[in-house]
């Protein structure tokens, strides 16, 4: 009801884009999919995406709101980080009292602590700050202290995925500012090699994190998330998927977002999603930033992912297109 009321007030932009959005589900629905799962998934996220894309937000207010949210995340994270390393006290360890799963930030057995702020684990913190930072930069187009603070806390969380997230954020900013990709790649590779090989810089990481870096390909967490086992997967299922509602994607392709997309929608459906993401991004570097978020948990099943994607599309692609139209109109007149 909310959706159709909203659409009666706001003009739907780019009808061909919305039709393209339906492509993965249409193709996936031809094979094992359960009809009600397909309908719920497509309708829910299609509605949510349209609502956020078509509503007219005040850009300045949105930037301010995102900045405040990042502020809160950074302050709470640093308070937890400093509290532990100065007193040994784990701040915000309240989850068990409310019947929730305990924080997964301190391994008592090996005395390994990683701050996560308001989140259950460092990876969740890194994912949230990554999404906020990318959106903040796209809206603001400036490098300021709040963006730097976000990257620093992601780095301090010692999430292996978070290290990659910092690289992607810096890459997006530098490429957008006109720095050549070759220079950026060589610089990042040099820094990473220095951090891993130079024993004098190991103080930046805990011994556990450094050990995970040095044996990354045999790390249990890495294998569980990115290990691939094609056994039991037919060619038909590989191309068209098992359908939403099927179990076991993490057993076949690993527990990450790419695995979920391929397992549920197949390679054909995954291509459809890539077209959607590229259209929303508007350029290759933002497209890579969107794809990177799927290298962790299956974000396509989270509402916040589609809100994030819709806002990127709304303020990046559509604003550029409208600006180009105005420029053309002024030049022609």
Regions found by a protein language model. Give the residues of each.
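Hydrophobic transmembrane alpha-helices and their immediate junctions
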Residues: 140-144, 167, 171, 180-185, ...
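Transmembrane alpha-helical segments and their membrane-water interfaces
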Residues: 6-7, 28-82, 173-174, 273-279
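A membrane-periplasm/extracellular boundary helix in multi-pass inner-membrane enzymes
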Residues: 79-84, 174-215
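TM-adjacent membrane-interface loops and short helices in multi-pass inner/ER membrane proteins
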Residues: 215, 220-252, 267-270
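Membrane helix-loop boundary segments at the extracytoplasmic
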Residues: 25-40, 257, 285-323
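Transmembrane signal-anchor hairpin modules in multi-pass inner-membrane enzymes, especially those
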Residues: 1-27, 60, 64, 171, ...
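Hydrophobic transmembrane alpha-helices of multi-pass, membrane-embedded glycosylation machinery
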Residues: 2-3, 42-49, 132-136, 148-154, ...
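Alpha-helical transmembrane segments of multi-pass inner-membrane proteins
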Residues: 67-90, 107-111, 117-158, 164-173
